Amino acid sequence: MTDLTPREIVSELDRFIIGQKEAKRAVAVALRNRWRRKQLADDLRDEVYPKNILMIGPTGVGKTEISRRLARLAKAPFLKVEATKFTEVGYVGRDVDSIIRDLVDAAIVETRARMREDVKARAAKAAEDRVIEAVAGRDAREQTREMFRGKLKRGELDSTVIEIDVADTSNPMQMLDPTGQGQMGMMNLGEIFGKAFGGRTQRRKMTVAESHDILMNEEADKLLDDEVVKATALEAVQQNGIVFIDEIDKVCARSDMRGADVSREGVQRDLLPLIEGTTVSTKYGPVKTDHILFIASGAFHIAKPSDLLPELQGRLPIRVELRALTEEDFVRILSETDNALTLQYKALMQTEKVGITFTEDGIAALASIAAEVNRSVENIGARRLYTVMERVFEELSFHAPDRSGEEVTVDAAYVEKNLGELARSSDLSRYVL
């Protein structure tokens, strides 16, 4: 759990997301409240519930990115889902309880990876011993083993093919799992038979280099207690979990709509207990959702936030509106963020020994075209920059291997040459950009 202050959290988010100050402050306070709750006495701690957030704003303005970066900062189990994937219980499709099961699965993987790091040194030694045994033989003398150990550390054995026994992770009874039911809280037939067939190994040929990760993971897992991994992951989900529900506006039954809105309101009703706090059965054990932070988001172009069920509105007390991005924002996105597209394209072309330099007027031209196409065709926010950049670099990307050693300057003239005609024709840009 992070102990960053709200100001520090916003500062970290500013490195990747331009603007949207109100949304950043809301999620920063929500995350800090997690830390504050941890400092309380036990009896009061259970009474303090997270204030769930509803983000309202057009597509491509940073709603998902804010949540994803927040989860990384928090080092918390995080899951992003689309509300449209789910149906009311009783209809064909996924029910909302699978959100928590997926979150637990993600937490188990995350926790196991973190715990593997803690035993990495011991696992590396055990993996090394297995490789040396495979190369030198089980009965090799200590002197021979040490000679091969030296070669292994120097990388001289990387291309040597060895034959080792590795765990067989396949489950021959997987077909017995009912379709879509593999995540239920009950143990299914496939799992029962899988356990009966568990512990099997299979002999495989591979190079020493290829065996490294496989043996490291196997040896690390031998040093880990599965029950501790499970308990730690469940605790992390219950206390620090973050669920981002996108496209919540798509499950609104609009007030002016008539007819059978199959399971739209039903999905909202099913979400109510999940967000309010309930216990969900998973194959790792029951999970209480009382203290999981839910962030819902939607564009609300057609539906309005007031079209959500009143009870659901009450469970999303913090509302933040994200504004549409302007041309100035696009300039800043291309030049100020740590993961700017300009830096990405520079690095990609550098792999082909082609140097790229972006001028200020070149960046301004890219931003101007993206903003113009958003205005004239469809506003998809910062995602338009991907399309524009890809089109500008299409020719260079194709011929880059033949242009090794060249320096290319991306200025306004270069952008105009590669994109000008397309941007000017609204009919063309509708289909191409």
UniProtKB/Swiss-Prot annotation:
Keywords: ATP-binding, Chaperone, Cytoplasm, Nucleotide-binding, Stress response. It comes from the Bacteria. Its main location: cytoplasm. SUPFAM superfamilies: P-loop containing nucleoside triphosphate hydrolases (SSF52540). It is found in: Cytoplasm. Coiled coil: none annotated. ATP binds at I18, G60, V61, G62, K63, T64, E65, D246, E311, R383. GO terms for molecular function: ATP binding; ATP hydrolysis activity; peptidase activity; proteasome-activating activity. GO terms for cellular component: HslUV protease complex. GO terms for biological process: protein unfolding; proteolysis involved in protein catabolic process. A double ring-shaped homohexamer of HslV is capped on each side by a ring-shaped HslU homohexamer. The assembly of the HslU/HslV complex is dependent on binding of ATP. Belongs to the ClpX chaperone family. HslU subfamily. PANTHER family: ATP-DEPENDENT CLP PROTEASE ATP-BINDING SUBUNIT CLPX-LIKE, MITOCHONDRIAL-RELATED (PTHR48102), ATP-DEPENDENT PROTEASE ATPASE SUBUNIT HSLU (PTHR48102:SF3). ATPase subunit of a proteasome-like degradation complex; this subunit has chaperone activity. The binding of ATP and its subsequent hydrolysis by HslU are essential for unfolding of protein substrates subsequently hydrolyzed by HslV. HslU recognizes the N-terminal part of its protein substrates and unfolds these before they are guided to HslV for hydrolysis. NCBIfam families: hslU (TIGR00390), PRK05201.1 (NF003544). This is ATP-dependent protease ATPase subunit HslU. It comes from Cereibacter sphaeroides (strain ATCC 17023 / DSM 158 / JCM 6121 / CCUG 31486 / LMG 2827 / NBRC 12203 / NCIMB 8253 / ATH 2.4.1.) (Rhodobacter sphaeroides).
